[in-house]
Amino acid sequence: LGVEMDIFSSEKSIIEKGFLNKVLKILKDNKLIYEGILEKPKGKADLDEWEPRPQLLFKSSLFGDDSDRALKKSDGSWTYFANDMAYHLYKIEKTKGNLINILGADHLGYLKRIESAVKALSSNKIKLVNKVCAIVHLMNDDKKIKMSKRSGNFIMLSDLINDLGKDVI
């Protein structure tokens, strides 16, 4: 496809380098986190067991997001979003220009919150460009192939290019 990756980073190494702690310090220093209670999510019929609880929240609504966002789960571990903020701070510190995210269409609801995070972490100095890709279903013998990074069931892009050609991709 003509795209070269020159930096590979793992979430674990970014957290180990202290970027989550840096995020929390930036947010605290700028009074952008607080202990609060989120409203019950709308449109979720299966949330009968949902209970309001105090949690650490990022004031993402100040930056155009629909609501403030939780940084910790009920079990005390960090949310995916908190770790993603650490990753974006890492990218902010590495770049001299704008950031580009390429996300699947299943992440559309995530765009505003991560844009808010980049604005807050960069003091509005870095622009985040989000590109969204369609979800593609691969078929084998008229059956949809279910892929998952977490389960280890996936097809490498290089294999698809070898089988189909890069123009199809």
Each model region followed by its residue ranges:
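Alpha-helical recognition segments enriched in aromatics with Gly/Pro capping
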Residues: 1-169
